[in-house]
């Protein structure tokens, strides 16, 4: 799985999620995809191919403007990457990697049927999440350094923390929808 992720990352072969908002949502939603895109993601996932998504981030960085003697907020666009792959039930696991560092307490797929990786390597995102990282490198939280450096950062933290589970839920919901449609002709009571 990791070798496949490295290859995809090297070739920049990602599906970019388009979020039509100036601020970040707190989680990835089905509405961010066309129905055909969800169908393609589900098909790729069920064929045990790696799903690779680039998730946009809108960061509001605080700068001290020496000339005006005041703080300014500058909008910065960045992103992080999410990889998912179906595996045998019970063999699932995931990790969040910020630069060279794993952030261990954000794991959500242990013992599931999915392998996952969140990769933070774009420079603005690296800086943002480094400032949000706890001293023991185990989670992202509202640190003093983050509060002093960024404005409106809560949704960015939630977006990353929930990204793997949200994408997995979109896939699972579509699988359930397909499964329900497949059996409705056999079990149509009173319709």
What is each stretch, according to the model?
Residues 1-191:
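Bergerat-fold GHKL/Histidine-kinase-like ATPase
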């Amino acid at each position: 799985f990791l070798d496949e992720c490295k290859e995809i990352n090297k070739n920049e072969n990602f599906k970019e999620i388009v979020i039509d908002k100036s601020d970040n949502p707190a989680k990835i939603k089905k509405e961010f995809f066309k129905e055909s895109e969800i169908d393609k993601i589900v098909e790729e996932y069920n064929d045990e191919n790696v799903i690779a998504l680039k998730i946009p981030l809108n960061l509001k960085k605080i700068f001290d403007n020496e000339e005006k003697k005041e703080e300014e907020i500058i909008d910065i666009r960045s992103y992080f990457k999410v990889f998912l792959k179906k595996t045998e039930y019970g063999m699932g696991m995931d990790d969040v990697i910020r630069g060279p560092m794993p952030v261990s307490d954000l794991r959500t797929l242990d013992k599931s049927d999915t392998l996952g990786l969140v990769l933070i390597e774009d420079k603005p995102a690296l800086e943002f999440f480094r400032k949000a990282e706890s001293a023991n490198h185990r989670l992202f939280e509202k640190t003093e350094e983050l509060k002093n450096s960024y404005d409106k950062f809560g949704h960015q933290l939630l977006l990353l923390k929930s990204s793997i589970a949200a994408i997995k839920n979109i896939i699972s919901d579509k699988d359930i929808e397909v499964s329900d449609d497949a059996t409705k002709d056999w079990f149509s009571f009173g319709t």
